[in-house]
Amino acid sequence: MERYKGTFAFQKDIGRVRVTNEDQCSVALNSYGDVFLCVCDGMGGQNKGDYASKMAIDSMMEDFRSMPWTPTFLLRNFLGRCYKKANSAIYEEAARNPLYRDMGTTCVCALIRGNKILVGNAGDSRAYSYSRDTLRLTRLTEDQTYVDYLYRTGKIQESEISSRADRHVLMNALGIFPSASFDIKVYPYSGESILLCSDGLYNNLSEAEIKAVLSTADRSDEKCAFFISEANANGGSDNIAVALWEVLPHD
């Protein structure tokens, strides 16, 4: 099984408009050679969104770090349990404490092992892969929003999405319902760069601009810092979170 050597970085920023930062991000590796990235974007206002995203990412990262050896064919089940556990923790805290009522969070994650990558998603944070060989940027997730649903069902055109006032309305997030709803997809992996981000990045940078940054020879931490800088330069309309994994070139 291929075990890739790589570098990673993650960074979050409050942006230029919001008064609190409700985004969270992290990356970790374990002794089995697995790589795990996670980005969460909280919702609910005041301190609710911040608390929900912190609960989610702490739960997801702790589950990854404490994961016993798990055969590759069972990793999908493992990720599902991670999502269910995080969802229950947030939902139960919101039900118990009126201060946190209606809080929730998006949660996108990527688990890389050998020649496979598993991508989990609840909400509208995104995962991308970028191939240095083909110079291709590929989105690995679908936004779970009302307008994306309208687009997928043929009720609106793709060109209409960015101009709609309801384009940020989520149809799914962790902590909103007692039962978790999430997507988990499995893709082949051959050393592509993996970027996870909140909507504060992709609403302020086009996919062409994201691809241009990933194609540079800059270090991973420099790319993350540049993503933040450019998103703020383009308005910084929301919190921004990015997590990046890049495989080192072979000698």
How would you describe each model-predicted region?
Residues M1-D251:
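PP2C/PPM-type serine/threonine phosphatase catalytic domain
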